[in-house]
From Swiss-Prot:
<dbReference type="GO" id="GO:0006310">
    <property type="term" value="P:DNA recombination"/>
</dbReference>
<dbReference type="GO" id="GO:0043590">
    <property type="term" value="C:bacterial nucleoid"/>
</dbReference>
<dbReference type="InterPro" id="IPR037278">
    <property type="entry name" value="ARFGAP/RecO"/>
</dbReference>
<keyword id="KW-0234">DNA repair</keyword>
<dbReference type="Pfam" id="PF11967">
    <property type="entry name" value="RecO_N"/>
</dbReference>
<dbReference type="InterPro" id="IPR003717">
    <property type="entry name" value="RecO"/>
</dbReference>
<dbReference type="InterPro" id="IPR042242">
    <property type="entry name" value="RecO_C"/>
</dbReference>
<protein>
    <recommendedName>
        <fullName>DNA repair protein RecO</fullName>
    </recommendedName>
</protein>
<dbReference type="Pfam" id="PF02565">
    <property type="entry name" value="RecO_C"/>
</dbReference>
<keyword id="KW-0233">DNA recombination</keyword>
<comment type="similarity">
    <text>Belongs to the RecO family.</text>
</comment>
<dbReference type="InterPro" id="IPR012340">
    <property type="entry name" value="NA-bd_OB-fold"/>
</dbReference>
<dbReference type="GO" id="GO:0006302">
    <property type="term" value="P:double-strand break repair"/>
</dbReference>
<comment type="function">
    <text>Involved in DNA repair and RecF pathway recombination.</text>
</comment>
<keyword id="KW-0227">DNA damage</keyword>
<dbReference type="InterPro" id="IPR022572">
    <property type="entry name" value="DNA_rep/recomb_RecO_N"/>
</dbReference>
Amino acid sequence: MFQKCEAIVIRAIDYGETNKIVTLFTREWGKVAAMARGAKKPSSRLSAVTQPLAYGHYLIRRSRGVGLLHQGELIDSMRVLREDLFAAAYAAYIVELTDKSTEEQKRNPYLFELLLQTLQYMSEGRDLEIMTFIYEMKMLSVLGIPPVLDRCARCGATEGRFSFSVKEAGFLCHRCESADPHRFPLSPASIRLLRLFYHIDLTRLGAISVKEGTKAELRAVLSSYYDEYAGLSLKAKRFLQQIGELKGTLDPGDGRNN
């Protein structure tokens, strides 16, 4: 029996000469895989709806393994994210993080909405790195590794100067900071943003402007925290790091990351 779902294509691989196997992150069932027969043919009605990042309604026959994709109706191709090198790199990281962090057929409508909203904001021209930071912060609860952000992770203090400790999985106050010689000193702006990004309702996100120095602090904290606790090996992360180095020497030209 074919069933209708709302989904985002988070992975697509070629299978044989004309077919694809697509991984869809659906609102209704979570992550599912489906065979798209003939989708590699440019003339196929499944060609556009099986492109990475495509968002639409799909009719599939589910199974315990790989199901069958019968048809799809495109809502948003997210084309702008595929055609810009920098946007494509950030979007690829977002969807791979989602893919590697979730189990097959485990429903999570909150995560679906988070992924959709993040990609839409990116396609609208929001700061790619800021949107990635927000997504990474929110994924920590999905992964079951939330940091302590509302108090000192050791003594519970809520006032004073704070740094971030990967070892203690959260903030350390100035009285406890000696517990981790490898802690990250943070500016007040970085502390506020880590808390904001973790708790913010994305549907109410306004304009956020962040200095490059603050971005560097956030980048270092999140990268180290994920390396320590997430246990994920992401190809897109390595590519994103290379893109970050390229950003230092080239102007992307569209103002996305300024």
